[in-house]
Regions:
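Extended carbohydrate-recognition surfaces in non-catalytic/accessory domains of CAZymes
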Residues: 1-90
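Sequence/structural signature of beta-propeller blade repeats across diverse families
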Residues: 19-30, 63-74, 117-125, 204-207, ...
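Beta-strand-rich ligand-recognition modules
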Residues: 28-34, 109-147, 152-163
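Surface-exposed coil/turn segments at beta-strand junctions on protein surfaces, enriched
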Residues: 75-77, 89-91, 129, 140-143
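Aromatic-lined ligand-binding clefts that engage carbohydrates, nucleic acids, or primary amines
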Residues: 86-110, 148-150
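Cytosolic-side membrane-insertion boundary helix
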Residues: 159-205
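Juxtamembrane segments at transmembrane-helix boundaries
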Residues: 186-344
């Protein structure tokens, strides 16, 4: 059917664009030091692997970090500093690009602040959460040595503040990479949202609940990409706390609507009382996203997956029984099950 075919198409579209990682050269930091003296930044973008030096519960740079004791990264640590010393050819203008830390970031190059996303502080009252893409300007100077310090604060939830993937090259190359990624994100997110509007119109005219589920799934898959949802869709002065709650809610709801769609595609697959109980439990879980403090919201998405597992196994058993009873496996079934196999 057209429903099964489009389900498979947008799943393939999502996989196609979400797996476009780019063509990068690898460069590994050792003990917080990156040797880039042999790099040709004019022709390549370098993906920085390895470890930066981490200083737990220290917001400083230069001599302050020299006097501090490095430590191991722990997600329970609410704030800290990452330091990377770059050795490159002298007198080069470079750009370090990457997404900001969860959930506020301040960057210093050779002790001078070059950008701050949100507000970094040693307490929740002193901090303001915000995320964005970072473009960090670097000049290697006479000796080719640069110190980059990324300070973060995370009083939003008990996980986060981990080192993000960084890329180093000329400003032109980093800008080209970012534009390419934005294009993938906009095409994928925009296409899924358009699919969602299409299915919503279909639901209005056809009066079938499965099209409502398809519309919601398309929107959830499109908006769960933070690059599309936060950086391109929301206005610059958005309320961060509300946006964060909706982001976690969209991740939480995804397995629910995928399973509700599956049971709606096959008539009488699940008993109505089972579907109602599952829907009520998930409605309570969804409401909790706007009741609990932000520190307790992130685990709700995992709870949603645990809550969905019994219903998923129930539907698998019912599908096996159905196909065994009718002894027929049609082309529509192949498309639907292939789409779900790719999603899971």
């Amino acid at each position: 059917s057209i429903t099964a075919a489009i389900l498979l198409v947008f799943v393939l579209l999502m996989l196609l664009f979400s797996n476009r990682s780019g063509d990068f050269s690898a460069m590994e930091a050792q003990d917080g030091v990156l040797d880039a003296t042999s790099a040709d930044f004019s022709s390549a973008v370098y993906e920085i692997d390895g470890e930066w030096t981490f200083y737990p519960e220290v917001l400083g740079s230069g001599a302050e970090l020299d006097a501090a004791k490095p430590g191991e990264r722990d997600e329970s640590i609410p704030y800290g500093s990452y330091r990377l010393k770059i050795h490159a050819q002298p007198k080069q203008y470079l750009t370090l690009g990457g997404y900001s830390f969860d959930y506020s970031t301040r960057v210093l190059v050779n002790g001078s602040e070059v950008l701050e996303i949100g507000k970094v502080g040693a307490s929740a009252a002193e901090s303001e959460p915000r995320i964005d893409y970072m473009l960090i300007p670097i000049y290697t100077g006479e000796d080719g040595t640069v110190e980059v310090v990324c300070q973060y604060a995370n009083f939003v939830h008990r996980e986060g503040g981990g080192l993000t993937q960084m890329h180093l090259s000329t400003a032109e190359n980093i800008d080209h990479m970012r534009r390419s990624r934005n294009l993938y994100s906009l095409v994928l997110g925009g296409s899924l949202c358009l699919f969602g509007m299409y299915f919503l119109l279909f639901a209005v005219f056809q009066g079938e609940i499965k099209y409502v589920f398809l519309a919601v799934i398309c929107a959830l898959l499109g908006l769960r990409d933070q690059n599309f949802y936060v950086l391109h869709l929301l206005p610059a002065n958005y309320n961060w706390a509300v946006a964060y709650r909706f982001l976690v809610l969209m991740i939480t709801l995804q397995p629910c609507f995928l399973l509700l769609l599956l049971q709606s595609l096959y008539e009488k697959l699940a008993k109505p009382i089972v579907v109602r109980c599952y829907a009520v439990l998930y409605a309570v879980l969804a409401a909790a996203h706007f009741i609990l403090p932000t520190q307790d919201i992130a685990p709700l998405s995992r709870i949603g997956y645990y809550l969905s597992m019994p219903f998923f196994l129930y539907l698998v058993v019912q599908l096996i029984r159905r196909f065994w009873r009718i002894r027929r496996f049609e082309w529509d079934d192949v498309l639907v099950l292939l789409g779900y196999l790719l999603l899971f």
